[in-house]
Amino acid sequence: MWTWKADRPVGTIVIIHGASEYHGRYKWLVEMWRSSGYNVVMGDLPGQGTSTRARGHIRSFQEYIDEVDIWIDKARTLEAPVFLLGHSMGGLITIEWFKQQRNPRITALILSSPCLGLQIKVNKVLDFASKGLNVLAPSLRVDSGLSPDMATRNADMIEADQNDSLYVTKVSVRWYRELLKTIDAAMVPTDAFLKVPLLLMQGGDDKIVDKMKVRKWFSGVASHNKSYREWEGLYHEIFNEPERETVFKAAKAFTDQYI
């Protein structure tokens, strides 16, 4: 876990990254928040980046939630309003974290292309076989089916990812089954977000997450203060796209309302 402190902080952003990636891919976004007066707290999820766990493998999705809980506790010690920004699987983790809290003490929440359904189609034979392998060989790793050019149109990011040894390309059978189980759980209606301001921003040309499932979740979520913005033509990683400065301005305009 790392902390980047602003000179005169008005808030603290906890960033929860997605599958395959790690904190090093967020240097630009971290600096944008920090230079705008926000502390940033972020770590690498279990099995990803510099974490010591087996790459691409978890025993339970709860491991992610427990890890993020530590980051949020750290953010609370910085004595500034705490905001969460969950991207992709990080958005799914954020949703499930909220559902487990009685008093989340979060000022506002941003979800970026949250993983609430997969756009990529998994081989049906593999999908069926994974149910048995989840019991017999849960740590067996298979190709994730994702490639850097599916996530963004940013050529610099694509090249960096293709040459990054920390970028996860294989995931375990258990990871896959836990992801699907958690997506199903997230779609169950909840009032966990009733009182927290929520901004959901979705890539309009997402090649990874099913934006129709994202829309369905957003339409069904109970909230007194929620807003949805779809970025036409943008791929999955809206904060890495060529238009990312415009996307960031929209995110900051949202958080600035609550400082």
Regions of interest found by a model, annotated:
Residues 205-209, 237:
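Acidic catalytic loop of the alpha/beta-hydrolase fold
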Residues 20-22, 49-78:
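Catalytic nucleophile-loop/oxyanion-hole region of alpha/beta-hydrolase
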Residues 10, 18-21:
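Active-site glycine-rich loops that stabilize anionic/oxyanionic intermediates
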Residues 30-53:
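Conserved alpha/beta-hydrolase
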Residues 194, 200-202, 206:
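Short beta-strand/loop motif that positions the catalytic acidic residue
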Residues 89-172:
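Alpha/beta-hydrolase-fold enzymes
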Residues 210-219:
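Short alpha-helix in the alpha/beta-hydrolase fold that links the catalytic acid
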